[in-house]
């Protein structure tokens, strides 16, 4: 009996061509954000702590301006719309698992992905500065302070009959890639999959992703 494909797809740098949090910080944040970014990359700060501190540098009044900026500048990776159509046609569950924030992830995926299939961090604009909330924080098996914990989400959403495929690009996708049955990877994640000998294939566009999925024998 063939297994059911279940897809877990990253957002920043995977669905979009660039990292949207970095784009926001470069455009709107004071210089202090750079040190926070470096501390995250050096693992001196958890992603949850670092991203929370970065957004706390931004006034809540900037919300609409930030969304307008991203909607006018961010680009979806080539073939993404066709990829979404392919998953719907084949009845393949597709979950977006993102370290991004709801106030920009939802508008950018509006009309493509239902909100209940998007798992990302939340936001609170009721105070002077933006506050990030963490509805998908680490479960009892993860202590990494992920923010939006992708390994926890895979454990929660996995199916007994599932063949779980992770699609991603960066360090924040590595832990969940290690749990997956198969990985479609680019950039940093591709190098790590090669180093760790994880079952994987490279992709550049989402047309490549569809080609790889069609070749996987688990497709009914």
UniProtKB/Swiss-Prot annotation:
Keywords from the named record: Amino-acid biosynthesis, Hydrolase, Methionine biosynthesis
GO biological process, one term: L-methionine salvage from methylthioadenosine
Record-linked InterPro entries: HAD-like_hydrolase_phosphatase, HAD-like_sf, HAD-SF_hydro_IB_MtnX, HAD_hydro_PyrdxlP_Pase-like, HAD_sf
EC identifiers of the protein: 3.1.3.87
GO MF terms, alphabetically ordered: 2-hydroxy-3-keto-5-methylthiopentenyl-1-phosphate phosphatase activity
Function: Dephosphorylates 2-hydroxy-3-keto-5-methylthiopentenyl-1-phosphate (HK-MTPenyl-1-P) yielding 1,2-dihydroxy-3-keto-5-methylthiopentene (DHK-MTPene).
Family indicated by similarity: Belongs to the HAD-like hydrolase superfamily. MtnX family.
Protein name listed in UniProt: 2-hydroxy-3-keto-5-methylthiopentenyl-1-phosphate phosphatase
Species this protein is from: Geobacillus thermodenitrificans (strain NG80-2)
